[in-house]
Amino acid sequence: MTNAVYLASASPRRKELLTQLGIEFTQFSVDADESQLPNELPYDYVERLARLKAQSGVALGYTDRPVLGSDTVVVIDNQSLGKPCDENDFTHTLKRLSGNTHQVLTAVAFATTDKVLSCVVSTNVTFKTLSDDEIHTYWQSGEPQDKAGGYGIQGLGGRFVTHISGSYFAVVGLPLYETEQLLQTFLRG
Ligand SMILES: Cc1cn([C@H]2C[C@H](O)[C@@H](COP(=O)(O)OP(=O)(O)OP(=O)(O)O)O2)c(=O)[nH]c1=O
């Protein structure tokens, strides 16, 4: 088996990040049910989804190379926040992130027909205090809509971040170092 993989993701960020790793890949999207189970912990949730996306790729017939699935959630007060469903939801989220530190959890999974291997990377991100105006203007930029927690650290949302501890790449959607390590372990095992 060569180093080439499949990327089971619709995310343009994950495509860019995987390109940055120099791994040859083919991208396709999978349609996974992303709802959280009752009482499911954020860590378990994000890891389950990454595995589900990878295994859905295998189930679609992409079986000749490892399939990479990944998922990102923002966690504050033990609650997982996905993409905002509307401006109200977004405003509520940004007010919770404002002036606080939250965690971004990104899970990565590789799957083939006979095995699946995954890991979760946690990064702490601290936001400055945001005004109502800043929050409203940011929503109108169109950037928050498709991003976990309603912000993009790599875009206009970057100016809200006063401190980050951990993997910047994991916040954007794919931790470079950990993904490469996981693939090496997967291919060896
Ligand atoms: C917090 C944060 C999230 N994000 C993105 C990463 C993920 O693409 C997205 C979270 O949604 P995900 O459901 O993890 O991924 P996705 O729907 O974009 O792609 P797919 O499921 O097909 O792989 O939020 C940023 O781009 N920047 C950030 O700062």
UniProtKB/Swiss-Prot annotation:
Keywords: Cytoplasm, Hydrolase, Nucleotide metabolism. One of its GO terms (biological process) is nucleotide metabolic process. Its main location: cytoplasm. SUPFAM superfamilies: ITPase-like (SSF52972). InterPro entries: ITPase-like_fam (IPR029001), Maf-like (IPR003697). One of its GO terms (molecular function) is UTP diphosphatase activity. Coiled coil: none annotated. Pfam families: Maf. The active site is at residue 71. It catalyses: dTTP + H2O = dTMP + diphosphate + H(+); UTP + H2O = UMP + diphosphate + H(+). GO terms for cellular component: cytoplasm. It is found in: Cytoplasm. Gene3D superfamilies: 3.90.950.10. It is an enzyme of class 3 (hydrolase). PANTHER family: BIFUNCTIONAL DTTP/UTP PYROPHOSPHATASE/METHYLTRANSFERASE PROTEIN-RELATED, BIFUNCTIONAL DTTP_UTP PYROPHOSPHATASE_METHYLTRANSFERASE PROTEIN-RELATED. Belongs to the Maf family. YhdE subfamily. Nucleoside triphosphate pyrophosphatase that hydrolyzes dTTP and UTP. May have a dual role in cell division arrest and in preventing the incorporation of modified nucleotides into cellular nucleic acids. This is dTTP/UTP pyrophosphatase.
